[in-house]
A protein has these predicted regions:
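NAD(P)-dependent aldehyde/semialdehyde dehydrogenase
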Residues: 7-113
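Conserved C-terminal structural/oligomerization subdomain of aldehyde/semialdehyde dehydrogenase
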Residues: 68-210
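Glycine/small-residue-rich pyrophosphate-binding loop that anchors the diphosphate of NDP-sugar donors
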Residues: 1
Length: 210
């Protein structure tokens, strides 16, 4: 639940995000009928409690009566901040920066395996590096969310974010129990399998094992 951005494009990216939020929801998102609300009062209070006013660069306003919280960007976030300690499930985007791809990769892999990873880059080598060497449940390159919008691709996590996948055929396979059965004929039962285990039996077995 965070944005990890190259420090060289940090300012430009935040400017574009702010512009796009205003384009989609207007100057006052809380008054926009198309802008959703938090599911209940308890969750609203939890999400609002994750907002550090000193780090808000966009949004930050909440309206308890309608259970709405503005799209909120927190900049200058550190790994120790409260917003980085749990899944957010709300309209808050913590922003952190990196100076090298090694630093970015280490930052992600040093934390619990994410359910999803979204890689934004025009460089195919960068795309492949993070797809192949960073563990995560699933994701997209230069897009978000769409990997779970199709029944032809499994959706699921790894480690702390869950095990197994579902959607489409993956759901059937994940939630089905496959029984392993050996069905042996009764007309033959090789005595070789049973005691006493003479030395010649050991030699015979080793011939096939090695």
């Amino acid at each position: 639940d965070y944005l990890l951005v190259d420090v060289r494009v940090h300012d430009e990216l935040l400017g574009l995000i702010k512009e796009e939020v205003r384009h989609m929801f207007g100057e006052y998102p809380l008054d926009n009928e198309d802008y959703g609300h938090i599911v209940n009062a308890k969750h609203f209070a939890r999400v609002r409690g994750l907002i550090d006013p000193d780090k808000v660069v966009l949004g930050g306003t909440a309206r308890e009566a309608s259970l709405k919280i503005e799209p909120t960007i927190l900049d200058g976030v550190t790994p120790d901040d409260a917003v980085m300690q749990e899944e957010i499930f709300g309209p808050i985007l913590p922003v952190l920066t990196f100076e090298s791809l090694d630093e970015a990769e280490a930052f992600i892999t040093d934390r619990p395996t994410p359910l999803a990873l979204y890689i934004f880059s025009q460089d195919r080598a960068v795309q492949q590096r993070f797809v192949h060497y960073v563990p995560f449940g699933g994701g997209c390159v230069n897009d978000t969310i769409m990997h779970l919008a199709t029944s032809h691709m499994g959706f699921g996590g790894m480690g702390a974010s869950g095990m197994g996948q579902y959607h489409g055929r993956e759901s059937f396979d994940t939630f089905s129990h496959k029984k392993s059965i050996v069905n042996k004929a009764t007309w033959l039962d090789v005595p070789f399998r049973y005691a006493p285990y003479a030395s010649w039996k050991h030699k015979f077995v080793r011939m096939f094992v090695h």
